[in-house]
Every structure is written in structure tokens, then in C-alpha cells.
Amino acid sequence: MHAPLTAEQRDVYDKYKFATYARSVALTRAQLDQWRDNKVIVPEPVSRAETLRVEAATRGQSKNALWNLLRLDRSTASRSSGGVALRSSALAFGNAQENRLKLANGELFERLGRLAAERAGCPVAETVLDCGMFISAFGLHSASPDAYFAMADGSCVPVEIKCPFNYRDTTVDQMRLELGKANRKYRVKHTALLVNKAGPAQFEVVKTHDHYRQMQRQMYVMRNAPVCFYVVRFKHNLVALAVPRDDDFCRKEAAAEGAAFVAFATENAGRVQFKRGDRRRASFAQNAADHGYNAAQVDALVRRGLYLSYGQLRCGHCDAFALDGPRAFELAMARPHEQCDGLALQEHEFDNVAFLDFTKRYTSLVDKRCDDARALRVDGFYVDDAGAVKTFCCGVHGSNASRRHLPTCSYYLAMGVNKIQNNM
């Protein structure tokens, strides 16, 4: 059982849950041009400060509920490596041994810290043994090394620890004795290590192994990490190697993740148009072959916030609604969308729902020659049959000088949060 999320963890989850984050991705025209020309996006979508905030909130990894939640649907350094999931017994052994190794080998981490300072060209500011999850600059990928060194220049150097179940009772010398005799060097099974057969043991890291790719993805996600330390535990032995950053590998990772980020942003920009009632209505006309709704039913669906896309009814305000277009009208109208911010779902609370329609409000104001009709319509005002200017939502009378709503008015609250500019 995991402890309940704290207020800070809940805030991180609400922002970086993969589906929510992907839906929030957006680009300005200048950023999109930057990507097309140079394959970079400035400023970075996720700042370093935010990355460290997420890391701090997810420490404990598998024992932390937030860490488990943020991994769902997100590409991680270990999952991207293509390896087969470990058996539960081997995984439990590895996790337990990693924790013991970190606690019992202070001298090892002191030596690795000195090497990290040499590679980074600056001193270690902090050694973090209980590491959480790092989010990439684009926010779509993540990595959870076993430990890391926070450097004085703001960079981080990861440490990846492997405790193979198969070598729990095998020393390095015993492992080498079991190797063949035909070759000078042999791959060490279940690791990314290559070792010589004869003479003092000399280890290398194989670049084609999943562990190597995992470490490179960690260095990519952690941005300017110049090196990763690969530590493999045998019985009575530890093998520790420095794995330099592969710039070509990291560039390819950035290109792939950046392309996915731009695709999300483009899709989101296309969806924004359906917050407008006229665009939702047009979707039914443009896809007439995909539905059998009459004009009155289309009007009702549009007012409910629905549009038609690729044969599916979707909500212009949330992701929770998806229904095949030809389904019965009554089913579409009754289908709930939980946590949807579409105002049509609160229409039973409005003073005059007929003027939920943006254009209707504007027409009523223009017909009565009201000054500043465009601004008044955005603020929810219309002119009633008696010639009074009032809000369609909470029924408050107003004017150019006074545009007040009731404090609990759902339209007023949505307008403040979402800066409504188009037809609901």
C-alpha cells in the first residue's frame, strides 16, 4: 500500500499525468517555426526547476504512489530499452540489493563523486541516493536512475545499479572461469559488460545492450549529463564503469520526442476550434454521411458541446466523451462527461439558456445599439425582451460601467479561468 498523495504530489500529478499533460501541450507560431527550421523549441516546455520538483516528489520510486502514476503511458528509459520484464523474484532481489549497496558502499560513491567532478568540470553539490523520476525538457519521456550526483553547474550525473539475480552467489572470478576458451573477450550475460578471459579482469560496456541504451536515455532526459556510472554487483565484487554521453544517440532521442511533442501540439490546436459552436455545427455538415441526426438534433448536440470527427462524437471541452456518430441521439445526449468544463453541461443553472449561444447575445446587443457590444457578449450579457442588459447565466443586470456576475456563477468562473473568447 502507498501513502496518500500530499498536496504537493497531487499538484504535480494534476499537471504531469500523461493524458492531461499531452492535452495541454501548445506551441506559439514562433516556436513552431523554430522547430521546423532548427528542431529546437525555446523556451523548453519543462524547466529545470520543474524537473527537479517532480524528481523530489517521486523519491522512493516503486514505493511512491506518484512515481507509479506518472509512469503510466509515459516513455521511460528502462521501458524504452526493449528488455523483457523481470520475474517478480528477480526484481525484488535486485531492488533490495540496490538499496543495500547504496547504504553499505559510501566509499564507492565518494570515488564516483570525484570522477563525476572530473567529467563535469565542477564539484558535486549533492549526492542523491534516494532518486525520483526525472521528466524530460519536452515532458513526454522520463528516467529514474538509482542515484545521481547534482553538480554545481546545475547538471546531474546518473548512477545505474544492476544486481543480477543470476550472479547473487557468483564472484567475478567464478563468472570468468565459466566463460569459453575460443575468444579473447566474452559478453557477461544479463549485463552490458564485456570482459577478457585471461589476465587481470578488464571490463568494457557493450553499446548494443539494453542497459547501454537505458543509460543513454537517462543522460538524454537529464539534459546535460556528461556521463553515467554503471555499477554491477557480483558476490563479493562490484564492477563500476563510466559510460560517456553519446551525443548522436541523444540527438535522435530529442528529434523523436520533439516530433511527438509537435504532433500533440498540432492536434490540440485543431481541437481548440471546437470550443466554438459554429465550428462544431460545421463538423456535422462536413461529415453528413457519418450521422443521421436532423437539424434540431444537431443543434442540441452542438449546444451540449459535441462535434463529429472521423465518425465519432467528441466533446469540445474534455477528453472523457467519445461515442460512435450513428448512435441514438438520446444516448448521445444522456452520456455523461465527468470533470468536463463545458458550460453546456451547467445549462440547467442558467437564467436564460437560450442566450448561451454567443451569436444570439451579440445580435441582441447590436439590435439595441448597445455600446461595446463585442465586449459585452464575451462577458455574458444580452438584451432581454424588456430592453434590459443582463447576464444570461446568473441574471444580473449590468451596463458598460458595471459587468458584475454572482460570485458562484459558473460562466463567470470559467471566463476568469479559461479567458473565454469564443462561442460556448
From Swiss-Prot:
It is found in: Host nucleus. It holds the Pfam family Viral_alk_exo. The keyword Disulfide bond does not apply. It comes from the Viruses. SUPFAM superfamilies: Restriction endonuclease-like. Its EC number is 3.1.-.-. GO terms for molecular function: endonuclease activity; exonuclease activity. InterPro entries: NF-kappa-B_Signaling_Reg, PDDEXK-like_dom_sf, Restrct_endonuc-II-like, Viral_alk_exo. GO terms for cellular component: host cell nucleus. Keywords: Endonuclease, Exonuclease, Host nucleus, Hydrolase, Late protein, Nuclease. It is an enzyme of class 3 (hydrolase). Belongs to the baculo-herpesviridae alkaline nuclease family. May play a role in maturation and encapsidation of viral replicated genome, by promoting DNA homologous recombination. Exhibits endonuclease and 5'->3' exonuclease activities. The endonuclease activity displays a specificity for ssDNA in vitro. Interacts with LEF-3. This is Alkaline nuclease. The gene is ALK-EXO.
